[in-house]
């Protein structure tokens, strides 16, 4: 039995609220159960130095957690003057994942930065950030079209992500913190709405996992992510 009472294949309740903040071209509050992340998409009329003159755009991401988003207060990384390795890893993952959603040549020389700020953490913050960040990105792209800075949206496909793992010997979908902290295997799966995999990150915390467990986890991920695509679609049509 999972601590939350959910069945192995049952994800947490997910809510996606668009236009959550006033100033950004795209903004979303995404909630995976008790995990809550604000994702904003900001457009700039410039590209990184390595892309200047190439006629291509860029999608990048930044990630952070509020000091009291967890059970005990964490010091701000800005106060320490250095980002931690986990933060750098996660924001690179978010950026890689969301670049797969967009035709960067069709984006032109624009940079879109997805800022993901965790206001409450209960496991799965990076997968929530990718799922909500994609919706914020779509709104930012549509803003560029509305402002006639692009003729049409360069969106190629939607992207969503979920965590899966093996908890007390059973493959489960969308781990919350109590499960994540005890899981024998923890995996993050990022997919497109066309059925392709963007990234699979999996680690055995105890005993190695078997092929059958891997197959079961990927099947759970695909099913849960299909539900996320429906929720993204509903949010964008609202």
Curated annotation (Swiss-Prot):
Organism: Marinobacter nauticus (strain ATCC 700491 / DSM 11845 / VT8) (Marinobacter aquaeolei)
PANTHER family membership: EXOSOME COMPLEX COMPONENT, EXOSOME COMPLEX COMPONENT RRP41
UniProt record similarity statement: Belongs to the RNase PH family.
Reactions that this protein is recorded to catalyse: tRNA(n+1) + phosphate = tRNA(n) + a ribonucleoside 5'-diphosphate
GO molecular function term, any single one: tRNA binding
Record gene name: rph
SUPFAM superfamilies: Ribonuclease PH domain 2-like, Ribosomal protein S5 domain 2-like
Official protein name in the record: Ribonuclease PH
Residues annotated as binding phosphate: 86, 124-126
Described function: Phosphorolytic 3'-5' exoribonuclease that plays an important role in tRNA 3'-end maturation. Removes nucleotide residues following the 3'-CCA terminus of tRNAs; can also add nucleotides to the ends of RNA molecules by using nucleoside diphosphates as substrates, but this may not be physiologically important. Probably plays a role in initiation of 16S rRNA degradation (leading to ribosome degradation) during starvation.
PROSITE patterns (UniProt xref): RIBONUCLEASE_PH
Subunit structure, as described in the record: Homohexameric ring arranged as a trimer of dimers.
């Amino acid at each position: 039995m999972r601590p939350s009472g959910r069945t192995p294949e049952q994800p947490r309740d997910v809510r996606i609220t668009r236009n959550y903040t006033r100033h950004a071209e795209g903004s979303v509050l995404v909630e995976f159960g008790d995990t809550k992340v604000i994702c904003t998409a900001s457009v700039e009329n410039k590209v990184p130095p390595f892309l200047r003159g190439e006629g291509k755009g860029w999608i990048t991401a930044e990630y952070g957690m509020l000091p009291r988003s967890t059970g005990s207060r964490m010091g701000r990384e800005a106060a320490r003057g250095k980002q931690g390795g986990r933060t750098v890893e996660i924001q690179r993952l978010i950026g890689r994942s969301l670049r797969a959603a967009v035709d960067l040549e069709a984006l032109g020389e624009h940079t879109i930065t997805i800022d993901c700020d965790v206001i409450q953490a209960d496991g799965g913050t990076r997968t929530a950030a990718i799922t909500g960040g994609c919706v914020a990105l779509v709104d930012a792209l549509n803003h560029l079209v509305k402002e006639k800075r692009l003729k049409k949206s360069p969106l190629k496909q939607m992207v969503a992500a979920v965590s899966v793992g093996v908890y007390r010997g059973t493959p489960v979908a969308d781990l919350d913190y109590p499960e994540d902290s005890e899981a024998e295997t923890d995996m993050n799966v990022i997919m497109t709405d066309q059925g392709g995999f963007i990234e699979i990150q999996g680690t055995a915390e105890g005993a190695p996992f078997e092929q059958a467990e891997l197959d079961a986890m990927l099947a759970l991920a695909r099913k849960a992510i299909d539900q996320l695509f429906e929720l993204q679609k509903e949010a964008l049509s609202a």
